[in-house]
Amino acid sequence: MIADGMRAVLALGLFIGCSRPPNNNARADSSFAALQQRGETAMGVDQYTSQHIFEPLADGGRVVLQRKETDPAGEATIRAHMRTIAAAFSRGDFALPGFVHATSEVPGTETMKRLRSEITYSPRDLPGGGEVVIYSKNPEAVTAIHEFLAFQRMDHRAGMH
């Protein structure tokens, strides 16, 4: 009886150990592919051939978007997008991240809206694209900015630098 139980456990372990690994291909992940498509619609550039960075800083953070390949038209599109979101975020308008992430509540944005007069958004051109540097002296705003960046980083499967 115990031997039969051990055989069953071993068989199950062998089955689990030999099963196929999870598919880590981002294009095959339908929810991520949908996010990427919405991102391309919102930002105007192919998300698979662009790099996102969402970096927290002691006094805020930065959002970076750059082309992975030389693409002057794409770089100009990114720079225009960065200016657009900096202006929108300054007004407390976070509709674009809501659209891209298919949610009405992007973490951190309610506080960022409420404290918008204490947060600055500075778009800057970078080689291959651009960035928005987000700055505040208000600790509550900085915490919200970090929540916003952490969510973005996770959902976009992006890095910090």
Language-model features, listed with the residues they occupy:
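Intrinsically disordered, low-complexity terminal tails/loops enriched in metal-binding residues
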Residues: 18-161
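Hydrophobic h-region of N-terminal signal peptides that target proteins for export
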Residues: 11-19
